[in-house]
């Protein structure tokens, strides 16, 4: 299982939100590239970046910071937040991002996902952010009326490389990963899923490991590695063993 340390960028700084709320922000570092180096030094194999300003604005807002991170580390990086057209996809892949995560676009513009997967196979993931099984869109601001499992099936047909599944009600709350819902998405789509939202302790990693057989192949850890609730080095070692 791959552990993805999360670096959420807002206003050029590394922050964490609680339940995706922009009015509930904690700043953890002024330089996200330093954070990236720290996690890479721990042995991280892959980084998860989110352009929070981009998610809200619908276009990339922290490109200089993202560029600095890509120059600082040699490990692959996946990025989400405000990627809503082919021009942005091409630009970010050229910049050196390995995997791009399409969010709201998957619901509002599925043709974009289809086209991106055809043009850049293996580089496109879809973020399914859900509350009570319903997909949320536009920086989690509103519900879509679409069931998360149905969206997973549709995305699998397009040839999406991975799904990043976030249970919004648990994100940044340190209440534990919604393991069952994550595994259900993997089974529904027959596609690899990365768990996100709510990692509170090393136990969450242990709870996810048995679901690798269902297709849960990764886990994003955010707030817990910043507060010290999870030791990233320990989590990485555990995931490697599993």
Task: Describe the function of each predicted region.
Residues 112-119, 209-219, 225-242:
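C-terminal helical cap(s) of enzyme catalytic domains, especially alpha/beta-barrels
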Residues 8, 39, 47, 92, ...:
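Conserved, mostly hydrophobic/aromatic
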Residues 12-15, 19-23, 97-171:
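Conserved anion-binding
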Residues 73, 77-99, 180-215, 235:
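Catalytic cores of alpha/beta
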Residues 53, 61-118:
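Glycine/small-residue-rich loop that forms an oxyanion/phosphate-binding "nest" at active or ligand-binding sites
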Residues 60-67, 110, 141-150, 175-184:
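Charged helix-capping and loop-helix junction motifs
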Residues 46-64, 104, 165-175:
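Glycine-rich, proline-tolerant flexible connector loops at the mouths of alpha/beta enzymes
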Residues 2-6, 46, 74-78, 99-101, ...:
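Structural preference for beta-strand elements that scaffold enzyme active sites
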């Amino acid at each position: 299982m791959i552990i993805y340390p999360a670096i959420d960028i807002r206003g050029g700084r590394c922050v964490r939100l609680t339940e995706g709320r922009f009015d509930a922000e904690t700043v953890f570092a002024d330089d996200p590239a330093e954070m990236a180096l720290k996690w890479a030094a721990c042995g991280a194999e892959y980084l998860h970046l989110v352009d929070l300003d981009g998610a809200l604005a619908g276009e990339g807002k922290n490109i200089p910071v993202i560029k600095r991170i890509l120059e600082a580390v040699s490990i692959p990086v996946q990025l989400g937040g405000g990627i809503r057209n082919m021009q942005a996809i091409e630009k970010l892949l050229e910049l050196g991002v390995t995997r791009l995560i399409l969010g709201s676009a998957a619901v509002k513009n599925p043709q974009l996902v289809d086209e991106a997967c055809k043009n850049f196979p293996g580089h496109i993931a879809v973020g399914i952010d859900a509350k009570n099984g319903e997909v949320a869109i536009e920086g989690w601001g509103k519900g879509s009326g679409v069931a998360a499992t149905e969206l997973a099936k549709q995305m699998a047909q397009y040839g999406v490389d991975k799904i990043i599944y976030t249970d919004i009600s648990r994100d940044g709350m340190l209440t534990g990963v919604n393991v069952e819902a994550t595994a259900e998405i993997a089974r529904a789509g027959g596609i690899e899923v990365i768990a996100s939202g709510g990692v509170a302790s090393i136990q969450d990693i242990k709870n996810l490991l048995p679901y690798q057989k269902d297709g849960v192949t990764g886990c994003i850890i955010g707030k817990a590695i910043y507060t010290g609730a999870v030791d990233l080095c320990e989590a990485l070692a555990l995931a490697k063993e599993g």
